[in-house]
Amino acid sequence: MEKANPMYSSIYSQFPQYFGDQPWTAGPVYVGAFVMFLFVLGCFIVKGPLKWALLGATIFSVLLSWGKNFMGLTDFFIDYVPMYNKFRAVSSILVIAEFTIPLLAIFALKEILGRPEILKLKENRTGVIVSLVLTAGVSLVLAVAPSVFFSSFVTAQEMAALQQGLPAEHLTPVVTNLTEMRKAIIASDAWRSFFIIVVGCFLLFLYQQKKLKASFTMTLSLIHI
């Protein structure tokens, strides 16, 4: 909120920091930046059917959370899965992902602590690079250029409300300032996520180089998570 113009503070107090299409939503589902890195890495270094079950459940819960954006799957569950139509919000199904993502991340951490050399293996280098690109890389892009992923920072509903409640001469300054505020919020969160991932990876690197003990690394990683 550092970029907020004090002149319009009473207006901004009526809008949440979240600016998506979901009504009555204060923010997105959050599982942790370093957890996401370990989750993606786990897709490469964890072996066995449990990995595929956790990955499948994660993807499935995300698809179900799309609701009207994936009506075929949503309608099927509403029609054929008992009690599914009692959910007040389809996004509540993401509680599955909030369980499966950290669980696979923990399995990945277990593999690394049990076999420090696992990240040096040639077949796992691609996994490390992909994990960094999809987590730290995306966070860095969001931090430097938030506009890359968003065409607008003010929803159509918010714009309509502002047009009705503000004089024409104040509309453009308010929209511009609100846009800058939300860009700053995204950049701040993205920088934090980027540094969390970098610090977490550095801890794993130190453990791999035998500079840290397993118990100490696990403790720091769990705190980091």
Question: What positions do the PLM features span?
Answer:
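Mixed-charge, polar/low-complexity N-terminal
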Residues: 9-11, 15-16, 43-44, 63, ...
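Individual transmembrane alpha-helix segments
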Residues: 1-38, 182-191
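Contiguous transmembrane helix-bundle modules in multi-pass membrane proteins
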Residues: 46-223
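Hydrophobic, membrane-inserted alpha-helices
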Residues: 34-40, 199-203
